[in-house]
Amino acid sequence: MELKKAVIGPGAKVPHLTYVGDATVGAGANIGAGTIFANYDGVGKNHTTVGQHAFVGSSTVLVAPVELGDGAYTAAGSVITNEVPAGDLGIARGRQHNSDGWVARNRRGTRSADAAQRDRSDDRRLEILTLGSRTA
């Protein structure tokens, strides 16, 4: 954990692998592991306020200036850029998209591509065997 110009309220939990800069964390708040308080915008430093008994999910990025109200939650992996009012849940993360065959097309000849090729071949063999047993 790294703290810079931060005030941590009594009973608040701020675990390892967390950076808290230019922030106030309310009493009883819980900051998930890997959370980053992104306080510098390239020009100046901005403040983040986390309310009492708020819960910040692991690996959240709080982009200052931002405020989480008392009892507010954020979902793990979110990038929070706007206020999360008291008692609300802030979710800000993109939907996962898997680009089929990306490694084979873009990383040909690498160990990753070779491993993926073997795994996909094994999956296809299993699928063929499974389909064959259904028709018998």
Q: Residue ranges of each PLM-predicted region?
A:
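Glycine-rich hexapeptide-repeat left-handed beta-helix
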Residues: 1-132
